[in-house]
Amino acid sequence: MRALVALSLGLVALAGCASAPRLSPTLGQASTGERPKVVGSHGALSSAQVKALTARLSLEPGDNALLKRHMAIEQAVAESPLVAGETTHLLRDGEATFRAMFAAIGAAKHHINLEYFIFEDVESDGVKLGDLLLAKRGEGVAVNVIYDSFGSSDTPTAFFDRLRQGGVNVVEYNPMNPLKSKAGYSPNDRDHRKILVVDGAVAIVGGVNLSTTYQAHPTGKSGSPPGEPAEHWRDTDLEITGPAVARLQHLFFDHWREQHGPELQDLNWYPAIAPTGGAAVRIIGSSPDGATPLYYVTVISAIRSAEKSVTASAAYFVPTPDEMDALTDAARRGVEVRLLLPDKSDSPNSIAVGHSHYADLLAAGVKIFETHDLVLHSKTVVVDGVWSAVGSSNLDHRSVIFNDEVDAVVLGSDTAQELEAMFADDWAAAHAIHRTTWSQRSLGARAKELYARVWEMWL
């Protein structure tokens, strides 16, 4: 799928080339004395409440200062609020995500909103998603679906027709057929988001598509070819309960209106949600229509300001110049920078482009680990043990230039420690790339890397 995106959409883009914006070297600089701004379910938190929050989110005395620094820097570049009072739960791989999704959908009382790049009739514990959604619709629960036209091009039309006939509102995002487009024909603008919102109170966001690739025995066309064993897909999602869910709801309805979805009955889409936990979350929606690629700016500013460590995973590592500079500069100033990257992918060219950057990364001191015996699809970042991100954005050009993305930034030590524990498991199953052996790779491999670089903007 990824290779097909690059080929077909990349050819279209040649007529009007775009590139990732170069960011100012001073981006994200903020005074450490600037008071972080945090909102709760009843509005802005006081200085005393913010102070108590940062103390609670820090496990070590030194973490408090790091946390305040990252809060101030992120505040200078992000346009969405940092929301306190959240409960977050990391979900490892498709099985855990689908189980959490199906549980939330099954408990829905008012509405279910789903927005996914790939939307297939996945199942969990023997229950099909389509059957569950239609059953909830039969109970009077509103069900609204946005699926990306390109990402879900392999999903049978009959599946969406069945949902519509059962009363589910279905919107096709940026139809590949220009005759069906309602918001202007822009085939390169793809909805890469993965969002579930239930009753305006619970949400799941991250890298997991509604794809049968995550199942032991894939049934959709996005899975392994017939007769071939299914490959394990490694991915990460985040379940959020609390006031920050409203931001994901806003993003969903922004796309619904943009794509001229049918007018919906007011079902209390934004209920008053009391604090459910102690996490602080910032939801960042990015779009090529915006003047600033918000998550891109945020993650680069976080890496540029790192003092101790940067740990990141990416399904498609096709770094922009600013991403390369941020990673190598951090390593050169003594920050431990570790990257978890795939050695196999549904986009071989993205692997080749990533490989073309390894020499510079290794020379700067970046530690690179490649997974094996699985397909890495996770997009996560941890900085200084206090700043964490889980979402749909990769370290690539497409996430900046063409895709609509959504990422959740969680501030505090607890989530960072959970993610680091996941990384520890991943390191154990990965192999390290060493500078000496990497320099001895074949001329054929180097030639493949150079060729793939021609297409890196669209990968």
Regions found by a protein language model. Give the residues of each.
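Bacterial N-terminal signal peptides that target proteins for export
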Residues: 1-7
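Residues within alpha-helical transmembrane segments of multi-pass membrane proteins, especially transporters
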Residues: 8-10, 340
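C-terminal motif of bacterial Sec signal peptides marking the signal peptidase cleavage site
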Residues: 13-16
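Charged, low-complexity intrinsically disordered terminal segments
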Residues: 18-459
